[in-house]
Amino acid sequence: MKLTCKFSTMVALIAVAFATSSCGTKRIVADGSVAKTTTTAQKTQNATADNSSTELKQMNYLRKVADNAVYSKNIVSKIKCTISTGDNNISVGGSLHMRRDEVIRIQLIPFGLMEAGRLEFTKNYVLLVDRIHKEYVKASYSDVDFLKRNGLDFYALQALFWNQLFVPGAQKVTDSSLKSFIADFSASPIKVSTTYGNMSYVWNTDNTTALINSVNAKYSGGKDGNTSVTCTYSNFKALGTKKFPTDIYLTMSTKMVKNASKMSLDLQLNTLSNDDDWETETSISSKYTQVGADEILNKLGGL
């Protein structure tokens, strides 16, 4: 009975298709203008179908990229941190502590003995601590001219360090916000891009796994010049059920920071864990001297 029903349905569909095509043929003989209308309608339908197919392909791929983000609330690792300022390369051991939506902390610990410096990003402030000279910078994102002009807030920086897509000005990527991204399948690797005001972002993704291999954030500053920050990811390893890069390499190009074009930061993660037994806030001793906010990057550029 089911087979008969399916067969009848198939015959009916073929009959309708045949009747439609036959009707179209008769109209060609009777009225050429109607035939043109029919052809135009068919082209419109085909174009609509193609657009729907392209949009579906876009969304499926963008979801795949977004779904590669790790589930962990915490990412902790011992690191080898290499800071290049052009003429000088400084390599030192340390640690990376990140808690989603709360803090990103890089600690520099030479020979694993004593902390020499600390760079910390939270939702409300940026903190740079120089343990050697007992100085520190603590400022909101709006107080740091470089971050303010380039639209870099905590969530943008978090996405860079966590190897994931982000929507400028938003805390997280939703299925709805994925519509603001474009996947360029003609490029290899596949490029995912979006724009926000004077900012443009391009993520290079692996054609097969959709893992993010690099991201470039560019700010068009007009008279102030352009600023570009590039983050490259490699050596992916398992972190829970997902993969996370164990080599994160950042470079920058801007006129707003001294020697910025020569600066780079390379973080090699030696151990990955989701340890949560650590404090998210750093307390500063009264013995430390606070310096100006704009020195937060110029201090590094002057090394």
Q: Where do the model's predicted regions map?
A:
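Flexible, processing/modification-adjacent segments and terminal tails
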Residues: 59-61, 131-200
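Bacterial N-terminal signal peptides that target proteins for export
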Residues: 1-10
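Transmembrane beta-strands of outer-membrane beta-barrel pores
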Residues: 81-85, 110-112, 252
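N-terminal leader/targeting segments and the immediate start of mature chains
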Residues: 24-88, 293-303
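Edge/loop elements at the starts and ends of beta-strands within beta-rich repeat scaffolds
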Residues: 67-75, 86-90, 97-99, 208, ...
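Gly/Pro-enriched, hydrophobic low-complexity segments
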Residues: 5, 25-29, 173-289
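An acidic-aromatic
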Residues: 103-155, 159, 290-293, 298
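C-terminal motif of bacterial Sec signal peptides marking the signal peptidase cleavage site
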Residues: 19-22
